[in-house]
């Protein structure tokens, strides 16, 4: 998919192996994840560090892969109508639906890495669906998977230089995970084209610890927990969905969803070099409740030209109880005016009320114009208006011109806007201070917004498809840790920083697609992304560390009716590190390290043994092009003890090597 990469929330390299989906360089926090059109927001329960990173796997793994019917990705202006968190784009995971006849499946998958220091995966899942009566049908699926953690010393020999008390520390590899989930759906078609769905889903993800900490340092507790479960995420959703359609062409989609996340993990430090490292062997649980009510109706009508208007409203409420992130002591740094030193509330919440309208107007047989408008009122950040305008123009039988512009937005997180969330640094994390400082939440933050623009030309003839798109996002009010103090403690010794809005940033690039029907049995599909600019205009630094270009290519051959073969290639361009350290000074030495371009190839084959049984086998990373994590992006340490962990630049993640895999799929 063009425009899509994996990256972290910032350029820090912290939690470097917890890469998530990034669309058009806007970062994972601006990628809205939906499951069957409903938001999945469990990652929001994970504490946001000083640099914006979260120790999370994201929200894309709550559905077993074999239960996914398709994945829809919206990019640019088209995503703006989805509101909060969709400034980069939307990933909608569509699950398999109920069936009119009784059907079931049982699937298994395993892989074997060539290198024993890389974690292997085993996975199994099942599904069952069918009718209960003329009007009632059901669907049930579940899965279990286990991925082992990488070896604790997988990056031995590749780490950046480390001295003093850090001499024997290593950046961690990829952590493992045990994933269990089940999903039940009861569908009632109570009248013609009128359906009411009742759904319950439960998921549990527990990690297998690989030794990672926010600053890649260690202690005895870190070492003793390697391979053990140190955090677990429970996600439960209850949903009711009403879909209706009438012979007039009017249709409606309405749902209510309650999502509860319990995020349980070992207690972590909140100060300086100990931020994100285990503080003791006790567990804390953060509870996030997310309630969403959504209603929309689409009405076709003729007023000069055929049109379809969509009108809708949405209500979202988030409530979080987080007893662990409001516990930073003020004994050393001094008291912060207006904030309780010892008894800060663990509760935070936000509400969003939304109205939206969109009109698809068929101006001519070859011209479709789609204006739209969304209004959001956030209980903390206030009002936001998001207008949009998209045009699709056929240029003869072979070409289509597409263009669009929209204002997208993202509200502050419950950590960024919570004044009781306090972090502390003795100096290295303080952008403009010579001594210690605090970072506290800010309830006066504005919502982030982005003016997203694109224009593209597409050629299509039979199964041929070629296209190129230019996109530009003018990003405003991005929320980051402040660059200048806004006050001092009551003793006047410690500066106070807040989360603040950064005035301007720009992301722009090119996307291309080329699909070639080589023959009746061979297809060659390609896409590419080239980043022209990705810059915070206030600091001059990059917004995220992503490849300069990415090219994906897939060659598929249906050799016989029962046998298919596939070859894949992904070519990643150069990845440049951040330009400036936390003090705003130019990076030096190994902090300037780049990741050179590299290519990952894959081969696979699927054979249908019978109409109900198929087997797939293949090799990922055929030529064993591995990448090793050297550390976090920039140098940190203690001049008094001469203990340093030198910066790794862009070398902040692991790319696994050659891996053999096999899957068996059965169905009836």
Each language-model region and where it sits:
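C-terminal beta-signal and adjacent terminal beta-strands/loops
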Residues: 43-44, 476, 571-580, 606-668
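N-terminal periplasmic accessory domains that precede
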Residues: 1, 19-22, 34-36, 58-61, ...
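Face-selective signature of the C-terminal outer-membrane beta-barrel domain
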Residues: 187-205, 227-383, 392-396, 467, ...
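Transmembrane beta-barrel wall of Gram-negative outer-membrane proteins
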Residues: 117-207, 234-236, 303
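Gram-negative outer-membrane beta-barrel transporters
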Residues: 107, 362-366, 470-475, 486, ...
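Short acidic/polar hinge/loop motifs at secondary-structure boundaries
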Residues: 40-75
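Membrane-embedded beta-barrel scaffold of Gram-negative outer-membrane proteins
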Residues: 108, 241, 251-267, 394, ...
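Extracytoplasmic beta-strand/coil segments of soluble accessory domains associated
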Residues: 2-43
């Amino acid at each position: 998919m063009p425009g899509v990469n994996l990256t972290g929330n910032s350029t820090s390299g912290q939690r470097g192996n917890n890469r998530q989906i990034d669309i058009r360089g806007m970062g994972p926090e601006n990628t809205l994840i939906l499951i069957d059109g409903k938001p999945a927001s469990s990652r929001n329960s994970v504490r946001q560090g000083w640099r914006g990173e979260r120790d999370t796997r994201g929200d894309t793994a709550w559905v077993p892969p074999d239960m996914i019917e398709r994945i829809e990705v919206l990019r640019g202006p088209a995503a703006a109508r989805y509101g909060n968190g969709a400034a980069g784009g939307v990933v909608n995971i569509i699950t398999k639906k109920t069936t009119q006849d009784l059907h079931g499946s049982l699937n298994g998958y395993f892989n074997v890495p060539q290198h024993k220091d890389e974690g292997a995966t085993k996975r199994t899942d099942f599904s069952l669906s069918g009718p209960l009566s003329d009007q009632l049908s059901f669907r049930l699926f579940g899965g279990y998977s286990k991925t082992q953690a990488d070896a604790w010393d997988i990056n031995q020999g590749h780490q950046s230089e480390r001295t003093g008390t850090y001499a024997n520390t290593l950046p961690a590899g990829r952590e493992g995970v045990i994933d269990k989930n089940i999903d039940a759906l009861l569908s009632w078609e109570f009248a013609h084209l009128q359906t009411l769905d009742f759904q319950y889903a439960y998921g549990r993800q527990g990690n297998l610890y690989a030794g990672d900490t926010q600053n890649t340092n260690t202690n005895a507790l870190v070492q003793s927990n390697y391979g053990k479960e140190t955090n677990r995420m429970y996600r439960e959703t209850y949903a009711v969905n009403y879909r209706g359609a009438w012979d007039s062409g009017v249709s409606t989609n309405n749902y209510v969803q309650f999502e509860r996340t319990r995020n349980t993990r070992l207690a972590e430090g909140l100060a300086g070099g100990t931020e994100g490292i285990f503080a003791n062997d006790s567990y804390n649980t953060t509870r996030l409740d997310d309630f969403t009510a959504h209603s929309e109706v689409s009405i076709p009508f003729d007023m000069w030209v055929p049109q379809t208007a969509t009108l809708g409203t949405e209500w979202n409420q988030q409530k979080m109880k987080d007893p662990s992130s409001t516990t930073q002591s003020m004994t050393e740094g001094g008291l912060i005016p207006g904030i309780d030193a010892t008894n800060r509330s663990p509760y935070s919440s936000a509400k969003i009320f939304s109205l939206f309208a969109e009109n698809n107007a068929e101006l001519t047989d070859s011209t479709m114009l789609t204006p739209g408008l969304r209004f959001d009122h956030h209980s903390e950040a206030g009002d936001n208006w998001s207008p949009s305008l998209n045009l699709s123009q056929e240029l003869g039988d072979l070409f289509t011109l597409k263009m669009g512009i929209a204002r997208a937005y993202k509200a502050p997180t419950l950590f960024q806007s919570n004044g009781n969330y306090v972090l502390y640094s003795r100096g290295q994390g303080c952008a403009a201070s010579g001594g210690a400082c605090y970072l506290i939440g800010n309830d006066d933050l504005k919502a982030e917004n982005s003016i997203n623009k694109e224009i593209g030309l597409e050629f299509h003839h039979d199964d041929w498809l070629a296209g190129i798109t230019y996109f530009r996002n003018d990003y405003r009010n991005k929320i980051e840790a402040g660059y200048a103090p806004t006050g001092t403690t009551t003793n006047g010794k410690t500066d106070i920083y807040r989360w603040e809005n950064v005035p301007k940033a720009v992301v722009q690039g090119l996307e291309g697609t080329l699909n070639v029907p080589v023959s009746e049995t061979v297809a060659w599909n390609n896409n590419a992304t080239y980043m022209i600019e990705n810059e915070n205009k206030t600091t001059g630094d990059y917004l995220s560390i992503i490849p300069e270009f990415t090219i994906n290519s897939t060659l598929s051959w249906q050799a016989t009716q029962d046998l298919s073969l596939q070859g894949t290639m992904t070519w990643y361009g150069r990845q440049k590190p951040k330009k400036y350290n936390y003090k705003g000074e130019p990076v030096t030495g190994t902090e300037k390290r780049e990741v050179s371009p590299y290519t990952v190839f894959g081969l696979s084959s699927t054979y249908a043994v019978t109409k109900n049984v198929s087997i797939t086998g293949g090799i990922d990373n055929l030529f064993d092009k591995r990448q090793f994590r050297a550390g976090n992006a920039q140098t940190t340490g203690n001049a008094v003890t001469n203990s340093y962990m030198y910066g790794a630049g862009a070398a902040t993640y692991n790319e696994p090597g050659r891996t053999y895999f096999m899957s068996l799929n059965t169905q009836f």
